[in-house]
Amino acid sequence: MKGKLLVIGFGPGSFEHITQRAREAIQESDMIIGYKTYVELIQGLLTNQQIISTGMTEEVSRAQEAVKQAEAGKTVAVISSGDAGVYGMAGLVYEVLIEKGWKKETGVELEVIPGISAINSCASLLGAPVMHDACTISLSDHLTPWELIEKRIEAAAQADFVVAFYNPKSGRRTRQIVEAQRILLKYRSPDTPVGLVKSAYRDREEVVMTNLKDMLNHEIGMLTTVVVGNSSTFFYDDLMITPRGYQRKYTLNQTEQPLRPHQRLRKEAEPWALDQEEAVKQSASAIEAVQNTREETAASRALAEEALQAILGESTSAVVHQPIESIFEVAVSPGLANKKFTPVQMTTLAEVVGEKGTMEYTPDHQIKLQIPTAHPDMIIEKLQAASFLLSPVGDVFTIKACDFCDGEKSDAIPHTEELQKRLGGMDMPKELKLGINGCGMACYGAVQEDIGIVYRKGAFDLFLGAKTVGRNAHSGQIVAEGIAPDDIVEIVENIIHEYKEKGHPNERFHKFFKRVKNVYGFDYQDITPKIKVEPAPCGD
């Protein structure tokens, strides 16, 4: 049975601004997936739906889980504040589906349910600032290069758009709104009206009227939408108004208008409008010129391709794809047991990273590389030629092995390599680390990882569910001792596949083990330290 995806925009957050269709869709759903703050905002509308809530930067895992559950036959609601199609989850859900080869006719059904976007809800609190041409620009450069955002701000400022800035500032991103103000001041008066709206229609709503010059003197954060007026926007009685232009034709303080209805659309009543006849002539000339250019270009291209084909003796494609540069991330190490980098490897790292890339040594005995490139395959080839072990970065399975006393205690190495071969780099609900130690000393801390195996007296001990960070961090629970070497790989593999299949997005293994109570026949026991621990400020 096919499931269904309901991608819901629930507006600013107040129940009275949630559309009837959005309410119905929430009630229809078997499962609600969303950012945890958004789930809390609609808590009063939930009944017995299964809830999966995750933190910021987990949008992809939410979309993937939603698709997975819908393909399993469930009706899944993916929620966004505002409108799901405006910086929301709608596009990402489509992208995940497309990656899986989804087709509208044969795949799971998808419905996008619109909501009130921030530009609309904030405008209603400010007055009527978006009565004329407007645009939205997100200042978050986590996914969009800042150079491109700058161009968009510049274009909007030059064109006299009313601009609504989303995601203007965060704890780490503080310069973007400063740069946006600088660009706008090149084209607009310092007295241009600006409205700052925080948490529109929520409990901690704040509305501030200011101007372009002074806007940074007020608190601006991730929950703020910054609305910058155009050259005609004005303040009146604590309201921000952008005229539509009616004053050009109408007398707003009189009931008797100078132009009769049949006169208002005549050419002489709109001297500022585009001359339609001249525009048609110019358009026809432009089209003819473009057509001639295209024909000339096509002829030249055909001739060039014919010559190239004669040289190469094979057909060539007329389509040329411009390479797109992006940040390529990969983790490298000398090997699972080997912890020693060679001079050749270090030289190779310097070469492939270059001036623009970065290298970061991690606690997992790897070096994480971030390299701007349009050709990641060439980088992979160079790293492999230098005998690096390559691992993907993110929510994947990673082995953190000891050095087996520089190879002297090597009995566990073949099993380590087999686990890497079968599972290394596999996608997980959350990053999953398997610690492996080659003797009972466990000096590399295998018992402190999500899953730990320790080779001792010719067999393996198995530890599950360590909590690796926080004041209440603890070692894994020992669930089995003396596992035969021939069995350990299969046991670990089954545990990991069960976590991959049943774990929630962003759910760490120790939380998964606690929730399901039993993993591959191993029972959970609460070994959390019995002390009062305040929640970590980061939300751990």
Curated annotation (Swiss-Prot):
Reported effect, residue 402 to A: No iron-sulfur cluster formed. Low activity with cobalt-factor III as substrate. Normal activity with Co-precorrin 3
Superkingdom in the source lineage: Bacteria
InterPro entries: 4pyrrol_Mease (IPR000878), 4pyrrol_Methylase_sf (IPR035996), 4pyrrole_Mease_sub1 (IPR014777), 4pyrrole_Mease_sub2 (IPR014776), Cbl_synth_CobJ/CibH_dom (IPR006363), NO2/SO3_Rdtase_4Fe4S_dom (IPR006067), NO2/SO3_Rdtase_4Fe4S_sf (IPR045854), NO2/SO3_Rdtase_FeS/sirohaem_BS (IPR006066)
Enzyme Commission (EC) number: 2.1.1.272
Cofactor(s) of this protein: [4Fe-4S] cluster
GO MF, one example: oxidoreductase activity
Protein name: Cobalt-factor III methyltransferase
Gene: cbiH60
